[in-house]
Every structure is written in C-alpha cells, then in structure tokens.
Amino acid sequence: MLPVNKDQVLLQNTVPPGCPPQVLSQFVNSPAPNLASLCPHPTLPSSHFPLPAPPQAYFFSSLTQTHSPGPHFSSDSNSDFVPPHSSSHPRSSSCFGQNYTYFGEKLPSPHSISPSNYQLCVSPPLTGSSSLSQLQHSSPHSCQSPSRLQDLQSPKITSPVPSSPSPRIQNNKQTWQWPQSGSIKSSRGAGVCVPSKVDPAEFKDSGTLTQALVDHVGRRRIARDLQIQFLQRLWLGTPGHAPVVEYPICLVCLQIRTPSCPTPKYKTVPQLLAFPQLLPCVQGQESGPLRIGIGFGLRLPRGQARALHLLPPKNSTPVGVESQEEALQRQKSTIQESVQITGTLFQARSLRSIDLQSPKPSQCSRSLLQEPRQVAASPKAGPSVSKRSVTLGSILRKSPS
C-alpha cells in the first residue's frame, strides 16, 4: 500500500468501507438504518480499498451531458467539486444520481460505452511499482464483494524491494506452490524394504556382489559424495589418509539401509566402501600417466561372509600356498641331502689320492703305522704332519677293508 496522504484520508472519511463512491450521495444525508440496505455485503476494512491515493485530487461527475471535459474538468450545474485538502462532505446529492461514475481527468463519451462495461481510469501522475489493470464489473448497483476487491489487484506486480505480504491480502498467483512431502515418492516405493530378486548367496564372489551393490546405489551418487569429501579436506586442510565413503547396506533389498529394513543378525552392519584409487590411463601399462579412479570394497562380518559362501572353506588351501612347517621340513631335508652328497664326494677324493701315492697297500699300511711313532719321537715337527696323520687315520677307519 502507498503512504497515506490527505486525499486518501478524505476518501476514507467520505466513503464508508465496503461501498464504492457511486452510491456516496445516497447515504450522505440519510439516517443510519438506511446504510445496511445500501450495502448488502459485509463491510471490509479500509486496507481492502483497491484505489491507492494519488498526489492529485479526484473529480466526481455524472454523465448527464455530452460535453468534452477540460484538463481540470469544468463542472456543470449537476456536478459537485470536492476540494483536495478539505474534510467536509459534498453539499448536494444530485451529482451522484447517475449509475455511471468515473474517476480521472479524461472521461469517455457515454454513447460509446455500453451499460454493462465500466472502466476504472487512473490519473496519469500515478507512477509507482504497482499499477491497476482495467477490469469489467458485472453489477454496478451493488457493493463490491471481498472476492471482487481481491481481483482488482493485478497478477503481475513487480516490486524492486522484497517485502513481506500483508496478512489480509492473499495473492495466490505470486506465491509458488511447493509440492508437499507426501507427493514426493522415492523409487523404492516410499522407503519400503522390498526383497531383491537375486539372493546374495548366489553370487559366491565378493567382487560380483560389490558390483551389484554399486549399481543399485548409483555411481554418480558415489562420485558426488567422494568429491564432497575431497573438497572438505582441501578446504579444512586436514592431513591424513584418503577419504573413504561408507554406505550401510541391507543385503535383503541390496540397497542403502533404511529404518524399514530388518535388523541385522550381527553387530557389524554390512558396509559398501568407496575410496579414490590411482589407475593407469592405458590398461596394461604400469608405467605412464595415471588417473584417479574409484575403488570399491565390501565390509562384512566373518560369520555372514561364510554364510553367503564368500569365503573359501578351512580345509581347502589354494594352490601355491604352503604352510611354514612344510617349508621348514623341506629346508631341513635339503640341508641333509647336501651334507650327505658332500661327504661321499670327499671320501671318494681321499681314496683316490691314497691310491695314487701308495702303489702297494702293504707299504701304505706300514707307513701309516710308523707315522704316529715318528710324531711322538719328534715333537718339533710341524702341524701339517699331525693334521695329515689324523686325516689319514680317519679315512682308513671309514674306508671298507
């Protein structure tokens, strides 16, 4: 509403709320009981009056003569003039005897207007953010109802400064009707846990089960959540490991867990993990430019993973994997074999050397028996003689006779 000035005060004082000025002359000098008969509709407060107050005064006239009005509307004998700054009432009631009443400086000819069409003209000096549109009135003799007064406002009202709407004026064309929460339904049927057609035990592989869960959750959503985690860490500057996004999963519907999903049997809830991963730009080439990809993992309790046949049985060991005990036993056996092989080779070499040095076995035996005596008789002999005698004696003892 425009600020209240003297002209608006004049209109509000002379015209009671709820009735247009065309019946003003009929109740100026009439008693109070006749007012109810003139206005059959309930009265409205002054804030519902559709005409804003212009800076100039309005002129009221009847269309009894076909003269052209001047710039200030020269009135005749059957018209009255309301001064702009006076609070007095009009003197005579003859000027409002006609049914055709217009406001403004320019009045159209009465012959060119049909009785059923009436226009509302506003003076040119009115310039503001709001403008009144020309509307057609169907019942000129009766007072305007609240619905009529509500329709007088234009649906296209532009204001440079946003302001809170008046509690009395309701404009449904300007307010955006947001959809209610009940009308928005999720793709899962309003959050109901619907069992999946595929049993998780049929996958028999954690990789295929993880891919199925990723397809149900949505790769775009996972990428967006991981990107938000990246930006949050960059903004806060928190060091640490790479961000990991965790999604609690229901293995009944193969979707993200909701309150309608059944309670899990185990304490740890199955979770789908998404984390950044460095991958080569060209598959199969480890050396070269890298790109950032998304890796996925599945966190399950051991009992549930075993029930879904995602873990190998305890007895069956994969090919190529050996226990530590077996490895130690094999090492011991190889060490013993190597020692035996080296012992036999050393014995063979020593026997060959003895055969070459002593052409006759009788002489060799005699010389070996005499060597200890020589060692005892000559204690100053070198250590090489004693070593040689010891080695030869041990060889003779071990060699077959």
UniProtKB/Swiss-Prot annotation:
Disulfide bonds: none annotated. The gene is Prr30. Residues 69-80, 148-186, 357-368 have a biased composition (Polar residues). It comes from Mus musculus. InterPro entries: DUF4679 (IPR031461). This is Proline-rich protein 30. Coiled coil: none annotated. Residues 83-93, 129-147 have a biased composition (Low complexity). Signal peptide: none annotated. Residues 69-93, 129-191, 357-401 are annotated as: Disordered.
